[in-house]
Amino acid sequence: VKATKITFEEICNVWNVELWPERVSAIEPHSAMTWPFEGSPEQYDMNIFEYNPIFWGVYIDNKLVGVNSGHRTTDTQYRSRGIWVNQQYRKSGISQMLFNMTEHQAILEGCDMIWSIPRKSALPAYIKFGFETVGDYFDEGMEFGPNIYVKKRINVNS
């Protein structure tokens, strides 16, 4: 098993085919969506595009079997986005490995919280890693719902 940073082009191929097939909106390296539960941010913030996104992949026998990405959405909030694990390799710890890399990057960038908007079907992997749900499931504005907001507080000093 090899876990490593990958390029946007590499992750985009997986996202296009596996995670978001026939997606209507363009797949970009970032999302401008904000965490809506603290303060009163606009739903979208184009300043998010100032932050660098990072992309990770997990390889087994030189085959890309899992991906995730992350980027800050504020100076202290980090979004986990686009996790996918090949059906054959699910429930084998790959999502947890990807979340670990995401959390480590968030800590390196000085964030104290990670958030995401998983599909209902992916929620168990998030809960296992320590994410908590916020609010209820929703479909509005999501092409592959229902989705739910999740967050995890992280200790930057650990």
Region locations from a protein language model:
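Conserved GNAT acetyl-CoA-binding A-motif
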Residues: 106-119
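Conserved acetyl-CoA-binding loop-helix of GNAT-fold acetyltransferases
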Residues: 85, 91-104
